[in-house]
Amino acid sequence: MSQNKSKSEKLQSFAAPKGVPDYAPPKSAAFLAVRDAFVNQAHKAGFEHIELPIFEDTGLFARGVGESTDVVSKEMYTFADRGERSVTLRPEGTAGVMRAVIEHSLDRGQLPVKLNYAGPFFRYERPQAGRYRQLQQVGVEAIGVDDPALDAEIIALADRSYRSLGLQDFRLELTSLGDRHCRPEYRQKLQDFLFALPLDEETRKRAEINPLRVLDDKRPEVQEMTADAPLMLDHLDAECREHFETVTGLLDDMGVPYVINPRMVRGLDYYTKTCFEFVHDGLGAQSGIGGGGRYDGLMAQLGGQDLSGIGYGLGVDRTMLALEAEGVTVGAERRVDVYGVPLGKDAKKALAGIVNTLRAAGISTDMSYGDRGLKGAMKGADRSNALYTLVLGEQELENNTIAVKDMRAHEQHDVALDEVVAFLQGKLI
């Protein structure tokens, strides 16, 4: 009876919210490998890290990302804080970076300002493979120089970031979205085309606010209706066309392969001129693994100088899926250099001091806890993949020695307690 009662009173456990993935070991090793590879490539290219708030004033994204986008109109996590201020969990990184550049006057120094960031972003989407409500990204932004060579550098950096992981079966899609000089005429032509179609009310409203958004509609019936829509790439003015041709020429010179996709429309309103996306067909419908573009009017739109900028965001989650699709393994299995096995209370006290000294010396060290006995503790040593295992029992304490087991060579050395740190340093450092 008491057993049944205890079962009924058992507290309910919890699961992660829908669409929010955990990366527990061993998968966390792959997560760190992908994220760190992206960050390291950015640092090698002269980008400095910036740490951004997880939430911002809602107006920043409404004005910066664009109210006609699905991101702002449907996907943002927005709430009122205790001071009744409207704040939003960041759905993307560029607007926050631009806000920080303006706020801290980073644009008053040497240009371009080159910044990189990494972390979680939040969008209320329908969860499926590769589409999460908390997504992990690494991004870069280069602000203050209107130079197509910078566009090419950014694109090549993203390409190199993927290849540094061993990813191969992806493609770079590229286009130009024009600028404030040539886009208005194209916008009118596109609206004239769209308003002649039997669009539903929501799509028609989108065409009124930003007709490019309609070309980004993934519904088959809308894609079929817009198959013959006029394209921005055919309506570039001379300056934008020269800019785009310079970018593609530089990519050719750098050996970065690409395909031109004149129908590409990124999901954010601030893009101008160069726009690009990296696609991996092994992911099915959610094939985009990263992308970016130029945003020449964004800083002024957010209250700063009228400076140009270009950047990208690389999806860590989707890149992990792409690597899995190609059968590429990244992330070394967790391993410590040394694993300590104490046998008895006195041994545990002595070994704790040795473990602490080894860690201070830069040697990664773990230790067996609980009274598991030699057999159980050695199983822990095997699971740790340690290179060396230290066994300290009563006999070793009496002899003032410790057994050092070489787990690869299957050899054992009896070493004086006061010499074991130096002995292991000689083997490992």
From Swiss-Prot:
Record's catalysed reaction(s): tRNA(His) + L-histidine + ATP = L-histidyl-tRNA(His) + AMP + diphosphate + H(+)
Name of the top EC class for this enzyme: ligase
Keywords for the protein's UniProt record, in alphabetical order: Aminoacyl-tRNA synthetase, ATP-binding, Cytoplasm, Ligase, Nucleotide-binding, Protein biosynthesis
An example Gene Ontology molecular-function term: histidine-tRNA ligase activity
One cellular component term from this protein's GO annotations in UniProt: cytoplasm
PROSITE patterns: AA_TRNA_LIGASE_II (PS50862)
Subcellular location: Cytoplasm
4Fe-4S found in the keyword field: no
UniProt xrefs under InterPro entries: aa-tRNA-synth_II (IPR006195), aa-tRNA-synth_II/BPL/LPL (IPR045864), Anticodon-bd (IPR004154), Anticodon-bd_dom_sf (IPR036621), His-tRNA-ligase (IPR015807), HisRS-like_core (IPR041715), HisRS/HisZ (IPR004516), HisRS_anticodon (IPR033656)
EC number of this enzyme: 6.1.1.21
A biological process term (GO) from this entry: histidyl-tRNA aminoacylation
Domain of life: Bacteria
Family per record: Belongs to the class-II aminoacyl-tRNA synthetase family.
Record-linked PANTHER family: HISTIDINE--TRNA LIGASE, MITOCHONDRIAL-RELATED, HISTIDYL-TRNA SYNTHETASE
Subunit comment: Homodimer.
Protein name in the entry: Histidine--tRNA ligase
Organism: Corynebacterium glutamicum (strain ATCC 13032 / DSM 20300 / JCM 1318 / BCRC 11384 / CCUG 27702 / LMG 3730 / NBRC 12168 / NCIMB 10025 / NRRL B-2784 / 534)
